[in-house]
Amino acid sequence: MMACKGEIWLVNLNPSKKPNEMSKVRLVVVFQNNELNHSDYPTTIIIPLSISLVDDTEPLRMRITKRENLEKDSDIVVTQIRAIDNDRFMQKSASLSLKEMEKLKQLLNEVVS
């Protein structure tokens, strides 16, 4: 698996341990730095996407528009950031722009500050 920071991948988040954790096979944004992504490190930090759109929820969610193999507009659910095993990655779908990555970093900083 050679995911890069800012890429959107299809992953298998099943099984989830708690009802408030996002599960299913779904798209996620890779948020881990590329030094770790390109090493033998066994996990990757991701942020899940949802196609159940909720308006006016920044900094908890960030809307992105469809592109490449991302077939629908989606919300990045910033509060669901987590690490997953690299075996869960299935297929690359799209990428965020540099501007979108900067905004995502800013929103995550707001959530954890």
Q: Predicted segment positions?
A:
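Compact nucleic-acid interaction/catalytic patches
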Residues: 19-25, 29-66
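C-terminal terminal-subdomain/extension
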Residues: 1, 66-113
